Swiss-Prot record:
The gene is EFHC1. Its main location: cytoplasm. GO terms for molecular function: alpha-tubulin binding; calcium ion binding. The lineage of its organism: Eukaryota, Metazoa, Chordata, Craniata, Vertebrata. It is found in: Cytoplasm, Cytoskeleton, Cilium axoneme; Cytoplasm, Cytoskeleton, Flagellum axoneme; Cytoplasm, Cytoskeleton, Microtubule organizing center, Centrosome; Cytoplasm, Cytoskeleton, Spindle. InterPro entries: DM10_dom (IPR006602), EF-hand-dom_pair (IPR011992), EF_hand_dom (IPR002048), EFHC1/EFHC2/EFHB (IPR040193). This is EF-hand domain-containing protein 1. It comes from Bos taurus. Residues 93-198, 239-359, 416-520 form the DM10 domain.
Amino acid sequence: MVSNPVHGLPFLPGTSFKDLTKTAFHRSQTLGYRNGYAVVRRPTVGIGGDRLQVNQLSQADLDELASKIPILTYGQARQAPPAAFVPAHVAFDKKVLKFDAYFQEDVPMSIEEHYRIRQVHIYYYLEDDSMSVIEPVVENSGIPQGKLIKRQRLSKNDRGDHYHWKDLNRGINITIYGKTFRIVDCDKFTQVFLESQGIELNPPEKMALDPYTELRKQPLRKYVTPTDFDQLKQFLTFDKQVLRFYAIWDDTDSMFGECRTYIIHYYLMDDTVEIREVHERNDGRDPFPLLMNRQRMPKVLVENAKNFPRCVLEISDKEVLEWYTAKDFIVGKPLTILGRTFFIYDCDPFTRQYYQEKFGISDLPRIDMSKKEPPPMKQELPPYNGFGLIEDSAQNCFALIPKAPQKDVIKMLMNENKVLRYLATLESPFPEDKGRRFVLSYFLATDMISIFEPPVRNSGIIGGKYLGRTKVVKPGSSVENPVYYGPSDFFIGAVIEVFGHRFVILDTDDYVLKYMESNAAQYSPEALLSIQNHIRKQEAPAPELDGQQAEEDPGVRDLEALIDTIQKQLKDRPCRDNIREAFQIYDKEASGYVDRETFFKICGSYQLPVDDSLIKELIRMCSHGEDKIDYYNFVRAFSN
């Protein structure tokens, strides 16, 4: 009878039990892959996961397999070929041994230190057995550092031997160019390399430190005498109490400077000062809130600190004799903070109350700092050069493109072709100028003066235009405010100074008398009196001389007779053409004379109802010189 292999019971119904630990009842897999090849493996477990003893090697089989010599199976092994030769500069390329060392340097003539410890790195280059010594840079050491010994092979004795990596170890001294270096440690690569070459390394040592450098690293000890002032009490009493002052900084003395407004805050809790700039809309400045951060402000520095550059000075209590306090901020007084002068012009109500209670100062009025309009700048004209009119020359200074001066158009229209003519003589110390006569014409439309000298035959003086039409400045007036001659300045007996020449007015024409009569308010009593005296002299009968009778000039008598003859002929055929205006158009200077060519041109344009012989005789009598004709007397013959 078959029994159960587990517990030995007969394999009968009711005696067979199910093993709950067995879950896999498939057949073992015998096909697989190894190194890419399909292989067959013997199953090691059966159905249900029971291990099969049939396919397992025994211990004896395993021992037999282990005792087999591979040579018996595979034969004698071939000897490996020798490795290729590699030179030292290739094998040890970029392989460097690093040692940490130091040397001691004497410091003579120093009270603070007698020697100095300088830490270095010694580099040994395996490719060519060269060495270099590098000193790490220490900040603010004051000595040249960096490469002390450049890369080279270094001698170790007087026989010419050089240092080799076998001579280097931890805890030894080496001498290089008279300096003794103490090697204290090496890096990890150096330690591994030396140990691989069979060198036993000494234990590492502690790096020696420079005593003076370590002393400088220690914080300075301050010995401060305790004060009776209690800062904690000040902090608790004046916490959140701030004095506010309004100030300005006037920088107009510098180029492109201006006045800026600031707010100065003084914190009573710790006596610190803060300055803020007041910005306006569209002022074109960066809107940074603070000009100066909150800090204590030194007022008086010690003398030693003044010689030290302030740009690198760290201000402490040792450099400051006096700090700014609340009593230094007074309304109406300037205050210099860090080289910038501020003028305090106002404060807030809390500050006024604090000053009244603390210092007894109650008079802190607000100072008006509003911008005042500067007075208008008076334009300074360059000196007058004497050419042209002053108004015309001044236009070059008013605009880039000069413009003509403004003219009184209404005056020009009302006084068009109105000319005041005067007979004048030249006041001169020279006898040849005594008999010279001039015609002064004053143009009412433009206030200009022209002077014409009638030519006199055989006088030796060339007549004609003496002064072109221009404005004449009165003597004594300045170039800035020139005063020109006006109609009221011309009267009989008046002296007119024209550019250094003095003219005395002797007579006037009838139009001047009519103009003075209609505009008597413009003239002085002296001018009116001179005209009245002149009229009386003309109307008075000529006095009879004893034994003599005034003889009339025959030339004048003949001219008057000729004019009477022509006017008698014009009674039947009167001349209605305005000949005078035709001559005045060509006589720009209003001198009463025109040249001969112009005279005949004008006469040819009119049909004069007079005999040609009378006209030729009248032209001969009105001629002055070879080229000038007096058209005044000529026109007088044709006037009704």
